[in-house]
């Protein structure tokens, strides 16, 4: 990307909301990643449309960033435009048994709003460290619940900037996938359909799931969450543990001793370390069990 295009972004959106060569390790839960050429923080829908228009005109790749969870950015960074949709797109509103939320709303924030309104059905997502947008795209789930269980409709933007709604029955949601992911749509917001519940029971379930997460997951280290998808009929973490890889390290990346389904950053891990570790894990598990592990983490940049 030439300097003139970079300055165009700065002029249009302001130097306080356009960062050049911004280290992506500042914006991912893995705390790993080289610089993004242009990092933009739009304030509203119209600005997102304008950014996409510039990207189309100048033939620039772009990436929509929420909370930076479930993401591994290359050490060489990203040669394109990162569009961060978090705090400026974080509205959460309760209407009866429905919650209307914008794409940048944290799942934990939505879970708190649901609990305060005595609405049940979203407890599973309260501890997932991500935003609504990313969770909808990949049909995020935990503890027996998935986003598809609670979605009524989703507002999206296509790559041309057109905005429209997709009802839940047309989202084609499966295990860590959706039509939004396959079509490359941008999530702007969603309506969640929950049920009236008992406040004390909701609090008890929330506390129980939180305790499970804290006791079983390596929350004290940076990570991208679950590193591999769950193979049909198996658990990735158990396959990795039974392959003798608990605590296995490559550089600063390590298979968590607390939960083998997590690769953690022990302090100075690089994307190269993580990729090397994932490759070794995948090859070892396949050699021992004949099961191919697929990454759940998304890769951004050149690897």
What residues fall within each predicted segment?
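Gly/Ser/Thr-rich beta-alpha loop segments that engage phosphate groups in nucleotides
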Residues: 35, 68-72, 79, 106, ...
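Short, basic and Ser/Thr-rich N-terminal targeting/leader segments
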Residues: 58, 65-67, 150, 221-222, ...
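Conserved beta-strand segments that form the floor/walls of ligand-binding pockets within enzyme
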Residues: 31, 84, 100-102, 123, ...
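A generic local secondary-structure boundary/capping motif
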Residues: 70-71, 111-114, 122-126, 139-146, ...
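Phosphate/pyrophosphate- and phosphate-bearing ligand-binding catalytic cores of soluble enzymes
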Residues: 19-20, 157-284, 288-303
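Structural signature of FAD isoalloxazine-binding scaffolds in flavoprotein oxidoreductases
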Residues: 33-34, 39-45, 72-90, 137-168, ...
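Conserved active-site and cofactor/substrate-binding residues in soluble primary-metabolism enzymes
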Residues: 4, 25, 43-46, 105, ...
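Anion-binding (especially nucleotide phosphate/pyrophosphate-binding) glycine-rich loop
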Residues: 2-132
């Amino acid at each position: 990307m030439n300097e003139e295009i970079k300055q165009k972004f700065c002029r249009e959106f302001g130097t306080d909301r356009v960062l050049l060569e911004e280290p992506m390790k500042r914006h991912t839960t893995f705390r790993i990643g080289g610089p993004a050429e242009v990092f933009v923080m739009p304030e509203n829908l119209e600005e997102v449309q304008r950014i996409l228009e510039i990207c189309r005109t100048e033939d620039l790749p772009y990436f929509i960033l929420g909370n930076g969870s479930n993401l591994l950015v290359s050490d060489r960074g990203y040669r394109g435009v990162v569009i961060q949709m978090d705090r400026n797109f974080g509205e959460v509103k309760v209407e009866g048994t429905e919650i209307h939320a914008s794409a940048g709303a944290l799942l934990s924030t939505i879970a708190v709003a649901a609990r305060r309104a005595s609405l049940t059905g979203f407890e599973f997502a309260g501890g997932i460290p991500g935003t609504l947008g990313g969770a909808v795209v990949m049909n995020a789930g935990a503890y027996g619940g998935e986003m598809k269980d609670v979605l009524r409709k989703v507002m999206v933007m296509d790559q041309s900037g057109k905005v429209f709604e997709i009802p839940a029955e047309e989202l084609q949601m499966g295990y860590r996938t959706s039509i939004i992911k396959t079509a490359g749509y941008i999530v702007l917001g969603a309506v969640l359909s929950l049920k009236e519940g008992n406040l004390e029971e909701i609090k008890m379930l929330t506390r129980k799931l939180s305790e499970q997460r804290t006791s079983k997951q390596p929350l004290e280290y940076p990570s991208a969450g679950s590193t591999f998808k769950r193979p049909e009929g198996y658990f990735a973490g158990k396959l990795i543990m039974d392959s003798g890889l608990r605590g296995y390290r490559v550089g600063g990346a390590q298979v968590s001793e607390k939960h083998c389904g997590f690769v953690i950053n022990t302090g100075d891990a690089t994307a190269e370390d993580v990729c090397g570790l994932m490759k070794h894990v995948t090859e070892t598990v396949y050699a021992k069990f004949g099961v191919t592990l697929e990454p759940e983490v998304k890769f951004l940049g050149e690897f």
